[in-house]
Amino acid sequence: MAPKKTRHKKFSRDRYTLYLSKAMEFFEAMVDASQKKNWNAAGLAGVHCCISATDALLVKHAGVRSSSDSHQDAVGLLLAKISDPDISKQAKRLGEILAQKNLIEYVDKSFPEKNALILKISVERYLGWVRKLL
């Protein structure tokens, strides 16, 4: 059976700066929300930071970004399009970060402080890796 193809759209590689700018804005929002102990906002901003950072990386290096209905599909696209010694580790990290999105948005309880702080560390590490490759 052939591997599932991830839906994606083509973009001019110079457009990566738009997505990096969004990632940095979401990162700042995550930090600000964390300082105010707004854990739901901090968590969701962190997830969106990584989505935009992934878009920046894929657009710059491959001229594409995911257009799938599932954010998790970006993990497969990242593995298929980015060549780096840390890709497996960082793709796993991205998958774990993205898995938090539904918990933060749709579960009928607040995102716990402990989870938000752990997520913040993962986001910082993932964004650092992305910026190194840009």
Question: What residues fall within each predicted segment?
Answer:
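Terminal alpha-helical segments
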Residues: M1-L134
